[in-house]
């Protein structure tokens, strides 16, 4: 683990806050170059603290902090951009992704591409968005997250034979292996998907409801497998799960 003495103007997003002592906050931050870190924002809960309005979700910050231990001291914080995410589904999506980052990543383990994708997600969720658009953004982020963590999913080829996935064939998805063709008349069984839906997911085309549902199930199976016993609490609050 990297022990940081002092860092200035590091790009970061707030992914979780909680009260600390009488007037301070403990803040989980996802930074561009240092990964996920924890800081103490002293006095941030005071009514006149300038930190109150900037330590919020979907805000791109430039932070300065210091400390050798795992818990750093936040010395300064500048708001670079705030992405207005007001629609309930979009806001819940950010809450979901924030919890996913906490559960899936290790502290002080840098992932620049995940940070960039997170920023793109915030940009994409800002303003009015249709459910389909939001689901495409979420599935894209989940795929990149797993890929960057070393758990990428091949949506084009079978894992054992190496054959191309074909639209009319059916495939069993094993999160530890990938997709492999099966002989069955049903795709209702958990873990079995139609090739067409897998390929649509691969191309980012989720206009068909069956493909959207399949992509969501694939990612849930993969994430649950790699998270192990770290269940995502936000799921029970999301609508139409």
For each feature predicted by the language model, list its residue ranges.
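Non-catalytic alpha-helical scaffolds and adjoining flexible linkers that form interface surfaces
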Residues: 1-25, 30-241
């Amino acid at each position: 683990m990297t022990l940081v003495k002092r860092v200035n103007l590091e790009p970061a997003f707030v992914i979780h806050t909680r009260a600390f002592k009488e007037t301070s906050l403990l803040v989980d931050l996802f930074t561009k170059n240092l990964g996920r870190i924890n800081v103490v924002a002293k006095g941030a809960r005071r009514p006149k603290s300038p930190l109150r309005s900037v330590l919020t979700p979907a805000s791109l910050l430039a932070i300065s902090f210091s400390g050798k231990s795992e818990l750093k001291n936040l010395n300064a914080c500048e708001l670079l951009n705030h992405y207005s995410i007001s629609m309930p589904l979009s806001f819940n999506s950010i809450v979901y992704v924030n919890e996913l980052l906490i559960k899936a990543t290790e502290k002080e383990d840098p992932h620049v591409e995940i940070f960039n994708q997170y920023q793109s997600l915030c940009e994409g969720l800002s303003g009015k968005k249709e459910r389909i658009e939001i689901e495409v953004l979420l599935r894209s982020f989940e795929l990149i997250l797993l890929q960057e963590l070393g758990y990428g999913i091949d949506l084009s080829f079978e894992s054992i034979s190496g054959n191309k996935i074909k639209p009319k064939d059916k495939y069993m998805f094993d999160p530890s292996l990938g997709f492999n063709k099966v002989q069955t008349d049903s795709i209702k069984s958990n873990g079995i998907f139609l090739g067409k839906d897998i390929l649509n997911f691969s191309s980012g085309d989720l206009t068909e409801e069956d493909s959207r549902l399949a992509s969501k199930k694939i990612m849930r199976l993969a994430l649950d497998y790699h998270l192990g016993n770290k269940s995502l609490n936000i799921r029970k609050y999301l609508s139409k799960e």
